[in-house]
Structure formats: C-alpha cells, structure tokens
Amino acid sequence: MGLTDYRALLIDCDEVLVDRDSGVLAALQPLLDSRSGQPPREQVLAEYNTVVANLYPRFAELGFSGLLCFAHRQLAERWGLHASWEEGMSFARSAGSWALFEDAPGAMLYLRKFYRLLVRGDRDAEDRGVLCERLGIAPEDFISLADDLQWLSEQAEDVHPVLHVTRPSVAAHGVLDRCLIGRQRPRQPSRCAADYCISSMADLVAQHQLSLRR
C-alpha cells in the first residue's frame, strides 16, 4: 500500500516521538556515577531494556512508575550498588520530563491532517494528559502497550488500514504494515525489513508529501 492509502498511524511513543533513551540515561546518571568506570551508552540501555522486559509481565500489578522503580532497583543490584526506594521513585518520575524529539510536534501537526493518529505507549495517568497535549492527540488515542491489540480489534472499522510506525528493535505487531524509524542510525544499503524504512518523523512527512505529488 502507498502512504496515502492508510486511515490511521499507530505510532510508538518512546524512541519515535519521545527521546526515552536520553531521558533514561540522564536519570540513571547518579547511579552510574557510583560505579567504577562509565559503561558505554549502548550497554546501559541494553541492560535497562532487559530488566524492563522481564518486569513487564507484572505491569498490571506495578503500574508504570512501579515498573520503572523496580527496574532502577534491579539495575543497582546488577551493578553491585545500593539504591533506596526514594531514588527509584525519583527515577520513575523523571519519565514525565522526557523530551520530545525535535521533529515530533511538527510531524504530528502535519500528519493529523491526513490520518487518525494513535500513540502506543505507557505512562502514569497524571502524565498521560500532559503528554497527549504536547503531541496534539486526544487522550483516548493514547493506547497502552498492554491493550493495543484488543483496542485495534474493537475499532477495526474506524481505523483500518493502519500503518505501525515503530523503531527497528520492536518486533512485528500482528499483521499491521510497518514503517521503521531508524533514528541515530546510518541509512543501511541492505534491503528494508518492513514496508517502509526511514530516518525520522520529518522524513515520514517528506515521504508523504512525495506520495501526494505522484
């Protein structure tokens, strides 16, 4: 399908619209400062992602802040450090201040003229409304990672066909077409492993504009 054939975009929040990795690293810096030597950025993020993935089955029990708090504590234990629950909660609350990528607001403003925009992610209730306002979407269009498949099934007639805008590290999401946003990655000459492979949300806007001219 062409870019202009979709009715809705299901856009991953973190690392597509929100610079989660930079936010996580900044919030982990006090813990990292306690280590002997600074591990590479990629290593820290890989360990963080592993811990979060292992905790995610408990999301319904822990909630978003609880999950991040436990992730902080488990990272400290991995690194042979002590971290208080207060430090863990401070880390969890930092998610409310994670920055948007520079191109995200303008891209969302443009794309909502042509699509229904659905954002896929998790946040605490008190942060969700503010984030939706920053992204220019209605609160009901911010869909939890735990509920997205059921939601899409229930809303099929209103939103399909849907293009899933995600990052390369995320597995294929059901039968949805995929657009991979490869931020901070050089363009690869190898074959694209999705329906679309682009470098940023600004690039998605540019590709859509090209499609309109064809």
PLM regions: where:
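Secondary-structure boundary/capping signal
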Residues: 36-40, 83, 115, 119, ...
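Glycine-centered loop/turn motif at secondary-structure junctions
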Residues: 36, 80, 114-115, 136, ...
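Asp-based, Mg2+/Mn2+-dependent phosphohydrolase catalytic module
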Residues: 1-9, 109, 120-214
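Residue-level marker of alpha-helix boundaries and capping positions
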Residues: 63, 98, 119, 161-162
